[in-house]
Amino acid sequence: MRNTGPITVTKLHPLFGAEVSGIDITRPLSPREFGPIRAAFEEYSVLLFRDQPMDDDKQIAFSELFGPLETTGSANPAAGTKFQRQSNLDIMTGEPIPPDDMRMIYQKANYFWHSDSSFKRVPSLCSILTARVCPPEGGNTEFLCMRAAWDALPPALQATIQPLIAEHALLYSRNRVQKGILSAKAIAELPPVKQRLYRDNPINGRRALYIGAHAGHIVGWPKATGEALLYELSQRADQPEFRLSHAWREGDVIVWDNRAVLHRATYYDAVKHKRFMQRTTIGGNLPTVAQ
C-alpha cells in the first residue's frame, strides 16, 4: 500500500492490478485529483474502485478523463450509444433473457480471452466496467498480464513475432461461438484489420503481447501455421501466475488497459440470477502497425 497524493494504491497481484481508495470518482475530478489515477493506470494496468455507485452520466464523465469514448456498434443492444451492455436482462422489461436467445448466445464470446476493440484499425486504450446488478455467485472477470507474458517468451520467439502482423475481426471471435451469429450489417461495419503481436506503452516503455480471441491468422502465413502460432502464444500467456480474478459486488468500478491485459468473463447462472454491467471504452490514438 502506498499513498499517492489524494489516493491510496494497494496492489492486488504481484505483477499488476491495484485497488484505488480515498477518492470519490462519481463526482467531477480536478486534474490534480485525476493525475495520480492516470499514473496508477499506466503502472498497474488494472484499477479497482470500490463503493462507487455509478449512473450513466457519472460513468461518462469519469471515462472521458481518459480520452474520447468509442461509439457502440450495431451488434450490441446499446448500439449507437457510448455504452456496451453486458447483461442477461432485457433492455425493455428488465427481466432475464432466455438462454437460447441470440443475445445470450452472442455474449458467450466474452468467455474467451480478448482485448476490447482489437478488431478496430485503431484499437482502444482502455475499458471501464461498472457493476450495476451482480449475481450472488459467479460472473467474475479475469485478467491476464500480457506484459509478463511478453517478458516470459524466449528471446528467439520474441524476435520471430516482432515483425509479424495478425488479422483481427469481431467475426473471428463470434464464429468461435456459433457461425452466423453476426448480422451482415455488423460484419460490414467491422471488416478485418491488421495488428502487431505486441503493444508498447509510450509512457514507461513496457511491451505487452497482443493477441486474443479476435485474432484469426497471421498475415502472409499459411492459415494453419498462423493459427498454430496464435494458439501457442495464447497457451504461453494463460498461466496461473499471470492471472487476476475479480469477484464483483455492486458499486465496483474497474478500469483496465487494453494495451496491456486480456480479460474474460466467467460463468454464472443466467437463468436464476440477474447481472447488469455497463462498459465504456476509451479509444486509442494510433494503429499498432504504426508502432
Q: Where is each model-derived feature located?
A:
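Fe(II)/2-oxoglutarate oxygenase catalytic core
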Residues: 2-255, 259-291
